[in-house]
Amino acid sequence: MGQKVNPTGFRTGITEPWKSRWYAPKKEFRGLLLEDFKVRRFMKKKYRSAAIAKVEIERTRDEVKVILHSARPGVIIGRKGQEVDRLQDELQELLGRRVNLKVEEISRPEIQAQLVAEDIADQLVKRAAFRRTLKRTIESTMDAGAKGVKIQLAGRLGGAEMSRREKSIAGSMPLSTIRAKIDYGFCEALTAQGHIGVQVWVNQGMYEENGDAADAQEGQTPKKPKRSYKR
């Protein structure tokens, strides 16, 4: 089953934290979920050049806390923090609530699956050869410290008349092992011949085996203690 399901959803609540952390009554849930979608779509559309890998949202009664994980935080913050203040005002206008914005820098963007997928999509839009792009991307990701990489392209590759899939794998990719930290990213390349889907899986290693929820954050399920049997 781990071969088919989204690796992030497969691990969410067990070894991966939820990207949206809040509680709402049933009648308000739909509206708040739509707000989260609007925030993520707005950030991806306006700050594509900022290399945002993940957007986390936390809600309290008084405010909405938005945490941006970016490889280029300077693009979001701007000179003397002017850009981030403008962005905070835009988010408050979009949501109609007070917004607390926080920007965190990603230490190793080369092994972030979403950023790798977006980089491949940008190269395909610029008419780069897809096989050469796959080879270079896999080499750079493995050199950055990844334990394994899997990339799949789907569409009219190389301008071919018929769409097809091209897949390339390096290293280990234990998708069914929940202890394995598998990052997943997806992006679409809008080429002249049509859309090309880019899927990327990156094996970032194993979670701590004896952590007993040391890796889990608030809202996650801790590791259960071993059951003792009495004779």
Protein language model regions, located:
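RNA-contacting regions in translation and RNA-metabolism proteins
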Residues: M1-R231
